[in-house]
């Protein structure tokens, strides 16, 4: 026997306990046959998943996390949904810190009976309006907007900005939708921090490093830069689109990620690009991950120095 022999309504259950599989119509004899054939695979004591769910998890990190979240929901209770970092993984929202391997984040409504969470489950209790919940990879999960608000409430301000910027950049949420969820959570712990991150968010920050730099610049009291500014020569010939620009000072700052110059050709192209920017009268400051988090005061000092320097070299 294979799952194709079972009604479609039953096959939609990707993960369940023995009792849950029987509740959707699989008889004890069918269950034994399906497990012997490998159509249902034991993923935890008393919990079985379809072979397709297990195979998908092995080929796709998001599917893998979805399967882990589904198993965790079985343990905690079906009223719980994937949230916070787990929801960010499923939605493809960037995080400053990579989620711990094998850990799942869930939220359940207050007052609901809770099963016994196993090690590796972070369980939150909060209201879950139906409009804040969706389904991804067969798992109930908070919407992208609710996910961002939860992250911004529970993590640091910088981590919240990273999530807000990422979700805006990839079109996972809108300013209007964000404001609506913030109103729903206005009295919750961390709501003020989430509101600050939301107000500071920008779809124009193109990487986690750029989002973090925006926070560092603002906290140092630098003027707010223009993001992804298009720079041209006096003859209106396009030169480049730059990460940060302060037009009043003719200063550019570039966030150099780890993969930005991983090829000699790309490094040479960057040198030539900088020469053209300087020929156009701009002062260019580069900084890396290590500098921004290790010696941020030096990055700020270089930018302030560029503000004060003559326009052309």
Predicted feature locations:
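Short gly/ser-rich loop at a beta-strand->alpha-helix junction or flexible surface loop bordering the NTP-binding
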Residues: 1-190, 308-313
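Surface segments flanking catalytic/ligand-binding clefts of nucleic-acid enzymes
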Residues: 1-4, 8-12, 20, 25-29, ...
